Amino acid sequence: MFETAEGVNYISGGSGMASLMDWSTATFGRLIAALETLQKNYDFVLFDMGAGIVDWSLDLLTSLDEIIVISTAEPTSIMDAYSMMKFIHLKDNSKKFYLLCNRAFTIEEGQETTKRLKVVMERFLEKEVFVLGSLPEDVVVRQAVRQQSLFTTLYPDAPISKTMKKIVQQFLTHQVGIEEVHSTTQSNKFLSKLKGIFSKGRE
């Protein structure tokens, strides 16, 4: 585990989870024990699934308590986001989704992107989703990547940094708009669902 000065620790997962179903029961048990420890020691445990969702990652996503869906304004990205939410919703219609538009060139573009996804989910799946907002296209992100540091740390006054902090604060205080959108209590559903997926995959 790598620690950062900002209090956000991370584990580089690589592609190890792709062979999850091939693990022995003992190895999987150690994973569950480690995740239980993380749940006790951290306020939030985030899984960055990235682009290019495959079957095993979709199964993992269905076990999570809450899902933040990040899309750009590009039609292919919007379609991928909708397809993923539809797949998960049909497996578990109690899942909560939060929408975030990334790399928006204007405020209007970001709003239109999240609105399209929200409307389509409500119209075709009768599923309510929550809009977190949008992050603007900003050159400081690439500069921060080159320096291997957080853009919120290197460029705290950049538009994207201010927007990111606002969105995170809204989520941490359990408010999106004027509605409370997620529980302050810790859920144990994730681990029980993950165990179920592992057991099913080995049948």
Identify the meaning behind each predicted range.
Residues 150-203:
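NTP-binding/hydrolysis catalytic cores, primarily Walker-type P-loop NTPases
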Residues 78-97:
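Conserved C-terminal guanine-recognition region of P-loop GTPase G domains, centered on the G4
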Residues 125-152, 164-166:
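Beta-strand-loop-alpha "switch" segments that mediate conformational coupling across diverse proteins
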Residues 92-93, 121-128:
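Short helix-capping segments at alpha-helix termini
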Residues 72-73, 97-111, 134-141, 156:
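G-domain G4 guanine-recognition motif of GTPases
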Residues 1-40, 145-147:
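P-loop/Walker-type NTP enzyme "switch/lid" segment
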Residues 89, 105, 119:
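Conserved phosphate-handling catalytic cores of large alpha/beta enzymes
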Residues 33-41, 54-76:
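Inter-motif core of Ras-like GTPase G domains
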